[in-house]
Structures are given as structure tokens and as C-alpha cells.
Amino acid sequence: MLRFTEEHEWLKLDGEIATVGITSHAAEQLGDLVFVELPKVGAVLTKGEAAAVVESVKAASDVYAPLDGEVTEINEAVVAAPETVNADPQGAGWLYRMRLKDPSAMEALMDEAAYAAFPK
């Protein structure tokens, strides 16, 4: 199941673990990323809380926790090579994985069609 937030994050659910990243639109708006700061594994995140930071030559932007849960893994590759997020934001450029407190809460987020129609 793939879902999107109004803050331009995406989540892909596999069991109770969601992979989280920024959308292609967000990556394009930011421009070339030069720095990525990710949450610590084990961090407990609350929906809407700043979970990560992506910084480009134009601006720094918080990436918000899309739902409540605990960080289970981070993508060290994007810390070492932030440009990976620009090249493949919804693939190799994922940011972190989290165990969702309530996986059914994803239903309230936008699906691909709703996100495509969402004003950018």
C-alpha cells in the first residue's frame, strides 16, 4: 500500500513496517540535496513531528513523521550521497523505515490518484 501526505512525504507499507521518503515533487522543489539528517533507530515518532531534515543549496526542509511509530532502520546511503534522493526519491532515495503504531491509520492518507490531484 502506497500513501502520501499533504507535506509531500510518501509511505509504502510492508506488513507493519512503512518505508518513508519525500515525493518527486518535493525533491524537484528543493533542488540538489547536499545534506540529509535522519532520525535515530529506535526513535519514537509522533505524527506531524519533524523526523528528518533535507538540505539543498536553496533551503533546508523538515521531513515530518507521517504517522506514529518507531524508527526501525535508516538509509545510510542517502546520508553519504544525498543526491540519491534527487535521483530516485521514491526508490533508492527512501529515508527511513518505521514500525507503525496503527497500520490502519494509513487509510486516512492520500492514495496515488488523490495525491496527483492535490494542489502543489
From Swiss-Prot:
It comes from the Bacteria. The lineage of its organism: Bacteria, Pseudomonadati, Pseudomonadota, Alphaproteobacteria, Hyphomicrobiales. The glycine cleavage system is composed of four proteins: P, T, L and H. PROSITE patterns: BIOTINYL_LIPOYL (PS50968), LIPOYL (PS00189). This is Glycine cleavage system H protein. Keywords: Lipoyl. Binds 1 lipoyl cofactor covalently. PANTHER family: GLYCINE CLEAVAGE SYSTEM H PROTEIN (PTHR11715), GLYCINE CLEAVAGE SYSTEM H PROTEIN-RELATED (PTHR11715:SF3). Gene3D superfamilies: 2.40.50.100. Its cofactor is (R)-lipoate. The keyword Ribonucleoprotein does not apply. GO terms for cellular component: cytoplasm; glycine cleavage complex. The glycine cleavage system catalyzes the degradation of glycine. The H protein shuttles the methylamine group of glycine from the P protein to the T protein. NCBIfam families: gcvH (TIGR00527), PRK01202.1 (NF002270). Residues 17-99 form the Lipoyl-binding domain. One of its GO terms (biological process) is glycine decarboxylation via glycine cleavage system. The modification N6-lipoyllysine is found at residue 58. Belongs to the GcvH family.
